[in-house]
Amino acid sequence: MESNVVYKGESLELCEDFIDIGYMAENVEVTDSKGELKEIKRSHPDKSMTLLISFPHGQEGFIDEILKIDELLHHIQVDIHCYMIFDGSFEEQSVIKNRLKKFEVVLDTEDEFGSMYGTKLVSGSLENKLTKSLFLISKDGAVFYLEMPSDLEKQFDLERLRIELNKAYASYTGVGCHG
């Protein structure tokens, strides 16, 4: 995983720790739209998947991309917990929250997502913001698919996300590796 990303020609550095495909995802504490702490769990009793997506902010070109992703996931017919994560100082939360159908908007006020998933930017004009990232966590709590563009202006590959969602859903048997 690269430790640098680019946004509008500026090189930005990511924190050193990161989580990769195949690793067990981490539970993280965030703040919901009511200002209450909430734990995002890596796995759920109903065996649903989890999708964690972060952006540095919800302005400019990012809002259009956020709405496209939300529209795609709104039409997915399997249970999936979807979280749109921004840093703790994000102020446009209610504007975005009111436009989303599938995602719950949360803030990384405890700095757990940024630090544990390696999405925290530690230099440049977006210092202490979250980089653009997408983590698909399978039903068993492992990171199944990860996309973290090295150029923040590059959009997520939604066709690939659709394929990975299907693979993650179909590949889980519920019996473990010794079953």
What are these regions (language model features)?
Residues M1-G179:
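Chalcogenol-based redox active-site neighborhoods
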